[in-house]
Amino acid sequence: MKLTDRIENGIVILEPKGKIMGGPDASLLNEKIHEYIESERKKVVIDLSQVEWMNSTGLGILISGYTKLRNRDGVLKLANVTDKI
């Protein structure tokens, strides 16, 4: 998995590409989400348009980020979710 990130109008946009499964690649996404949360960013969008596959580890990362942001009065949204995901 590759990951690009940027900030537009105060909104963090993360764009993973490839498969989100366990291991170092999934850790990268998890770390990046939590890095932005710790830096007080309250709005995160994860664009899944280029994600080919996601297992339960990947789903757990998304749920963890969503929960942590919600607990800090923030929001995590998923964009461009394919039927496969």
PLM regions with names:
Residues 1-15:
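Short beta-strand/loop segment at the start of cytosolic alpha/beta domains
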